[in-house]
Amino acid sequence: MIVLGLTGSIGMGKTTAAGMFAEAGVPVYSADDAVHRLYSGRAAPLIEATFPGTVENGIVNREKLFKAVIGQPEAIKKLEAVVHPLVREEEDAFRREAEKSGAAIALVDIPLLFETGAEKRVDKVVVVSAPADIQHTRVLARPGMTQEKLKAILLRQIPDAEKRSRADFVLDTSGSFDDLRRQIAEIITGLSGKPAAATR
């Protein structure tokens, strides 16, 4: 089984691309979805113990947690020390299931793939990319997003140009959905030797 690592800076279209891989029959694991599950599950008491006042009714309040760690590298390291091992456990379970299912290709969607060294655990890296103006427009349209938040997030992420230079495949997400589906189908066909499953 070939494991693809999908990554890219915020607002570049990772979620859309991951959904299209899934449509094409590729099992997909999302680190972000795992974090959401963990924040309302087993990570919540650990985060409350590390950052008191950030959990309400057993669920992490992401806004309060963001305020507790923004601009504080040591606090971010503490948070990652709690969350990353749990996310890795979920990823390992996904890989075992995908292998068992007989999948030729599986995809792990990890926003901080390079930043956390996770590229060493995948066979090929797929980076989603779009021009900076499109990225900023997409991100600032999100509820609760501000220039300050975007700046803080981008400071933690390796620049887009470097990600592209380290990728095996680059998906240009600035065009139409059909164009993105075509790019994804080409990757799947090239790696598996079989046409991608019909995508709508």
From Swiss-Prot:
Gene Ontology BP, a term: coenzyme A biosynthetic process
InterPro entries: Depp_CoAkinase, P-loop_NTPase
Binding site for ATP: G11, M12, G13, K14, T15, T16
SUPFAM superfamilies recorded: P-loop containing nucleoside triphosphate hydrolases
One annotated Gene Ontology cellular component of this protein: cytoplasm
Main localisation: cytoplasm
Catalytic activity of the protein: 3'-dephospho-CoA + ATP = ADP + CoA + H(+)
Domain DPCK positions: 3-200
Source organism superkingdom: Bacteria
Localisation per UniProt entry: Cytoplasm
Pathway: Cofactor biosynthesis; coenzyme A biosynthesis; CoA from (R)-pantothenate: step 5/5
The entry's keywords: ATP-binding, Coenzyme A biosynthesis, Cytoplasm, Kinase, Nucleotide-binding, Transferase
Protein family membership: Belongs to the CoaE family.
Protein name: Dephospho-CoA kinase
Source organism (scientific name): Brucella abortus (strain 2308)
Name of the coding gene: coaE
